[in-house]
């Protein structure tokens, strides 16, 4: 058969049953603020970001360990305001934020990136600083390469087996950025 003709025929067919319009999700209760001296939760961070960012700002996400929390607490309001990698390529979002800021200079770009993911392409901080781009980076720190640990069984590790080289120290990302 002819693929073009087949697709055209499928598109010409009426829907067999009408699809209802999507309804907005119910609001999720605000997470509790951290107590003094305690670390904030990812949920509190994403909820707070949702409250303070403009609706037309662009989120560039690569925080695989926080993705379900991001989906729950950080609503996306318009097309072309949320970007992420499509197939697990680590190190995408720092440089992607630079590229998106170059492509959309009138928009505020917010990179939400895990600390492990950030280390794959940390030199993008230099590009963002050198080009004076409107990018804000939020580094979600769990002090590990979570994606590698979470997929360790696929790589042949046994349940609970330590994956060498995947724990991170407390990296000072502010100092790294200032060094740019």
Tell what function each PLM region has:
Residues 24-101:
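Active-site diphosphate/adenylate-binding microenvironment
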Residues 1-21:
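Terminal amphipathic helices with adjacent charged low-complexity linkers/tails
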Residues 15-22, 57-58, 160:
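Residue-level signal for secondary-structure boundary elements
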């Amino acid at each position: 058969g002819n693929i073009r003709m087949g697709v055209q025929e499928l598109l010409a067919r009426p829907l067999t049953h009408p699809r209802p319009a999507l309804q907005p999700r119910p609001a999720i209760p605000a997470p509790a603020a951290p107590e003094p001296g305690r670390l904030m939760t990812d949920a509190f961070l994403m909820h707070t970001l949702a409250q303070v960012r403009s609706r037309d700002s662009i989120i560039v996400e690569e925080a695989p360990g926080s993705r379900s929390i991001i989906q729950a607490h950080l609503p996306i309001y318009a097309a072309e305001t949320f970007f992420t990698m499509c197939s697990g390529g680590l190190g995408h979002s720092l440089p992607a934020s630079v590229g998106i800021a170059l492509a959309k200079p009138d928009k505020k770009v917010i990179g939400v990136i895990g600390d492990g993911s950030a280390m794959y392409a940390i030199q993008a901080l230099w590009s963002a600083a050198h080009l004076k781009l409107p990018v804000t980076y939020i580094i979600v720190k769990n002090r590990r390469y979570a994606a590698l640990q979470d997929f360790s069984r696929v790589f042949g590790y046994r349940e609970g087996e330590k994956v060498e080289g995947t724990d991170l120290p407390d990296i000072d990302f502010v100092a790294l950025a200032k060094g740019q």
